[in-house]
Amino acid sequence: LWIGRVVGGGGTAGPTVHDSMTWRVAGSLTGDFNDDWGWDVGFQRSRNEFFVGAEDTVKDRLYSALTGFGGPDCDPVTGAPGVGDCRWFNPFGSSLTGTGTVNTPELIDHIQGPYTIDANTRLTTFDGVVTGNFGALPGGPAGIAVGAQVREEETHSDYSELANQDAFMFVVGNPDFASSRNVTAAFVELLLPVSEQLDLQLAARTEDYGSGVDSTDPKLTALWRPTESFALRASVGTSFRAPSIFQAFGTQTTLEELTDPLVPGATQFLPVRTRPNLSGKTLRPETADVANLGFTYSPGDNLELGVDYWSFDYTDVIIQQNPQALLDAAVAGDAAAARQIERGPTGGLLRVNSFYDNASSLRTDGLDFSIAYTMELATGTLRLGAQATAVSTYDLADPQAGVIDGAGRRNFANFATSVPELRGNVFMNWQRDIHGVNVYVHHIDSYLDDGQPGSLRPIGSHATVDAQYNLALERFAGVTLSFGGFNLTGEDPPPVATNGGFDSKVHDPRGRLLYARASVSF
């Protein structure tokens, strides 16, 4: 058994190239039919071209070199191991010390192969909107907006030949992929000022993606202002999200940190190939029932207080099957999950094959809080405040992991993301003439790490300080200089038992970042 990098000590890091170019063209025309009615038509065309080039070890070439048949000019039929153009690859340290077979540069170059991705996406959009007033209500004129949109979405990914062959040891490979679709949409919105205190807004939107994938979603919003200092708002509606082109038709191989239940406590990076469900199962659109209820209270010109309750109830959530959940289910006896796990002759994990799937449900709700107080001082205007989000419920049904209470957990072995139950910040803004100072203290509460089977480990809370000083140059109208930093005290993210050592879905590992910026507005 040999575990390590093929070209480790003595080898240089392979070159990696990332090249991305995005361009966008947009235009619109507006006009009026009369004093009450107007129109707007628009066009947009955008394109992103993305190239990645790297090197990785080619499996067959390495295996040949380990048996003495390495090198670009070696013929394994007529040659002999280690003779002439056929060379041995020495994986041991003796290849560097001179006490063993030396790995020549030509052999190393031959073992490595190019892994490239040449991808592009294109989006073309036409839309039109007509707006106007169609009557009068006690609170003012009733308004309406009616619109339509046509979108053409295209994507294409071209991988190198070796990548198409799954020839690489680490990044494995990927098949080429190309697809497109046309989407049509229409909407209508009504603004009804029922009284001077009550506004109602009714809206509906319909989208058609073809192949029977369509949805019509209504929304009702109400704003009630019984006094000048108090406002109550509420909304209910539904939402709809169709599978993306990639989720419906694409294939991608990524490397993920997984724990084999047959080898508890040992984590490793393994290739996970996600692709369309080849069983013929159609990926359904994701739908949600959405509700919000909140208020703002502003007694006077200084204090502002706001509280909002929000709720999202998702059905047919579009997910990538969690590879860790697949592994756990396969070992527990799930025959369908076991067919998606590839193991070697000795039982070692080789690859996990996952699909984009529809989870049964996800329900989450919580509260948003905000408070701010503004003071006019002899030294300038000072504004102090705080904001926080508290997650009350995060219940999900994972196709492999079952019913999960995900609030306050890392959710390593299911489709959800990490969900700390409390996040918030306090801030101070000071402004005087051309000078301004902003200070923010960010806090993320502790939560539980469920990454190891049968155990829950606490992930510590995390607090960072950001600050910025702004100077508006009087001699140059519209020019502002900014100096500041993120995480000024250089706080490290709380440790997590992963190869990276932290939870990349929640915390930023970069430490203290300082910057200077000049901005121009005109």
Task: Give residue ranges: language-model regions.
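Short loop/turn motifs that connect adjacent beta-strands in outer-membrane beta-barrel proteins
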Residues: 32-38, 135-143, 194-198, 229, ...
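C-terminal beta-barrel architecture of Gram-negative outer-membrane proteins
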Residues: 255, 380-474
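Surface-exposed, low-complexity loop segments enriched in small/polar and acidic residues
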Residues: 1-183, 211, 237-285, 306-365, ...
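Transmembrane beta-barrel strands of outer-membrane/channel proteins
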Residues: 41-47, 144-152, 186, 202-206, ...
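Hydrophobic, lipid-facing positions within transmembrane beta-strands of outer-membrane proteins
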Residues: 23-27, 122-128, 184-190, 216-222, ...
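Solvent-exposed loop/turn segments connecting transmembrane beta-strands
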Residues: 180, 207-216, 371
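Residue-level signature of outer-membrane beta-barrel architecture
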Residues: 31, 132-136, 188, 192, ...
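C-terminal beta-signal and adjacent terminal beta-strands/loops
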Residues: 304, 392-393, 441-449, 471-522
